[in-house]
Amino acid sequence: GCGKSTLFSLMTKNLRPDGGRILLRGQDIAGMKLREFARQAAIVHQYNTAPADLSVEKLVGYGRTPYHTMGLSPDPAADEEKIRWALGITNTEKLRDKPVAELSGGQKQRVWIAMALAQDTKVLFLDEPTTYLDIRYQLQILRLIRRLNREFGITIIMVLHDINQSLYYSDEIVAMQGGRIRAQGLPEQIITPELVRSVYDVELEIREVDGKPFVIPV
């Protein structure tokens, strides 16, 4: 691979860097305890599993765990408010009593995002949030992600395979190849036929859609 999964694991404390530092709000994450990190950044991994009988509301409630001590909440009312908000913003409140195992792929992804939102962080990491989803659910997830950023000021850091989705829904992109960053910046500034050819080894034509670059095979 190009190295994006490794970079994602480094940024989310699943791997330790061999050298250098990774800073979150000016603080080296290597020195953060997991609880401290979880109060600042939430993560939705590409593959997620839950017990078959676990309800949506219970799963989303686990997002409050970083604020609990010995399994007890210091403020149950605040927990309930955050859970209710997370269910509402992801349009999953009607699913709250359903077992997670009974949900569709798109519903499950929104529920996992709801759990991350219940953590009440300013940074949200997403690893391939649209993988294996039908295009309708992909668009629902991407529009939700954009809304979280635009309306609620949450910084979104996500790994995407689809180049056009990356270009359209991102304010800044990082193109990687061979474990190194090839380019980084605004989509419209860094995406060129030469870059695409060198990274993807294909010939593409670049057009503009809503002010964003859109690539088409030629």
Regions found by a protein language model. Give the residues of each.
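Conserved ABC ATPase signature
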Residues: 99-103, 107
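Conserved ABC ATPase "signature" region
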Residues: 61, 76-95, 120
